[in-house]
Regions:
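Mid-domain catalytic core of redox enzymes
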Residues: 5-6, 29, 244-372
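N-terminal Rossmann-like FAD-binding beta1-loop-alpha1 element of flavoenzymes
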Residues: 8-35
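Feature captures the FAD/FMN-dependent oxidoreductase FAD-binding
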Residues: 70-101, 145-152, 232-240, 247-258
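Active-site/ligand-binding neighborhood in enzyme catalytic cores
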Residues: 119-122, 126-250, 256
Length: 381
């Protein structure tokens, strides 16, 4: 039998960054809130930090950066004393060579060689003189911006790994958003300055995101931010129910209130709420609202790209100094490799052990997603 109704102002589906930010702000305003999270242990969603024997592993490590002062202020409020400033070092691995990312002009020219560098510049000139006027795809946009040769070297392979589809089938809008503010000329000028040691601009959050030299990071990984947000919500008298999966959502047409059912370890829990905030995938949400929405077929057709991280603990020094390395090699499936100590030294407490995370992009249910742990470890090593 379902447990007795919990009556709250707001019910929230998912204890990831979106759900916990909403819960945090609502708790500050004095609202009653219940959050449900299907993971039995960790909050933070894709931004969680997994712990084993004192070692910490980020599922999807990314630097903390925002041009919104409101967002930065919120981060500082949740974690007032736990951000550290880290030097950014990331590289691209392509055809057996490493390229600094963002590019360093002299290094890139040397690695590519005179012939290929000349072809890249000729390709760029051609794109500027004869641009594609009918830009529809990621490939169209990127070729127009950088030329076909640079597109094929530094964009095509990695992007297709991430999204699992050809670049000429991806929207140009995504390219404009993801690579906004970055041009070949800007990258070359910035690369020249850094190659000569002349780039001394402070990391004030107002430079092009792709060119940032340093970044802020929670000292124990991003998961500690969402753990702190959860603790604040609970300390404020609200609930974060772990190991509770979203099951059903229906609205009372008379009162306008919502009846949400969650499946927990001890059976169903019913939450009665004036409002509901969902951070669940749209397919899951649409399929569990009753009555079913008219747009259900469209919602169920939405596709999501999934990924998994294979974390390895290796005896010895760090394998590389970078925060992460992009693998632009179509011969291997891995897309990015993280160095957890380079994110924060406190995440790897034993200096005799190196910890890396190999990221693989896949679709839920495909061969990679369904692989046994032993097979994934073998693939990663």
């Amino acid at each position: 039998m379902p447990r007795a109704d919990q009556s709250v102002d707001v019910a929230i589906i998912g204890a990831g960054p979106a759900g916990l930010t909403a819960a945090y702000l609502l708790t500050k305003q004095g609202y009653s809130v219940t959050v449900i999270e299907k993971d039995p242990t960790y909050v933070g969603g894709i931004s969680r930090t997994v712990e084993m024997d004192g070692f910490r592993f980020d599922i999807g490590g990314h630097r903390f950066f925002s041009k919104s002062q409101q967002v930065v202020d919120l981060w500082n409020e949740i974690l007032p004393d736990d951000f550290i400033q880290r030097p950014r070092m990331s590289r691209i691995y392509y055809e057996g060579k490493f390229y600094s990312y963002p590019l360093r002009a002299f290094e890139a020219l040397w690695n590519l060689g005179i012939l290929r560098s000349t072809l890249c510049m000729a390709s760029f000139a051609k794109a500027k003189l004869f641009p594609n006027r009918n830009v529809r795809s990621f490939q169209d946009w990127t070729v127009n911006a950088f030329g076909h040769k640079l597109f094929s070297i530094f964009f095509k392979t990695y992007t297709e790994k991430v999204w699992g589809m050809p670049c000429d089938e991806m929207s140009a809008d995504w390219a404009a958003q993801r690579i906004k503010g970055l041009s070949l000329w800007g990258a070359v000028v910035d690369g020249l300055k850094r190659s000569l040691g002349l780039n001394k601009k402070p990391n004030d959050g107002m430079e092009t995101k792709t060119l940032l030299e340093t970044f802020r990071y929670p000292r124990l990984g991003p998961g500690m931010m969402w753990e702190a947000a959860r603790d604040f919500v609970v300390a404020g008298g609200n609930q974060v129910l772990m190991a509770h999966s979203f099951k059903q959502l229906a609205q009372d047409q008379g009162t306008g209130r919502w009846r949400m059912v969650a499946d927990g370890p001890d059976g169903d829990v019913i939450i009665n709420a004036a409002h509901v905030i969902s951070s669940a995938p749209m397919r899951e949400l649409a399929g569990r609202i009753h009555p079913l929405p008219a747009t259900l077929p469209e919602a169920m057709d939405l596709k999501y790209r999934d990924f998994l991280t294979v974390a390895l603990m290796v005896k010895g020094d760090d394998i590389f100094p970078d925060n992460w390395i992009y693998i632009h090699d179509s011969k291997v499936q891995v897309g990015r490799i993280q160095n957890f100590r380079s994110w924060s030294p406190e995440m790897v407490p034993d200096t005799s052990i190196a910890c890396v995370g190999l990221e693989y992009f896949c679709f839920e249910g495909d061969g990679l997603w369904s692989s046994a742990d032993a097979d994934l470890i073998a693939l990663a090593t």
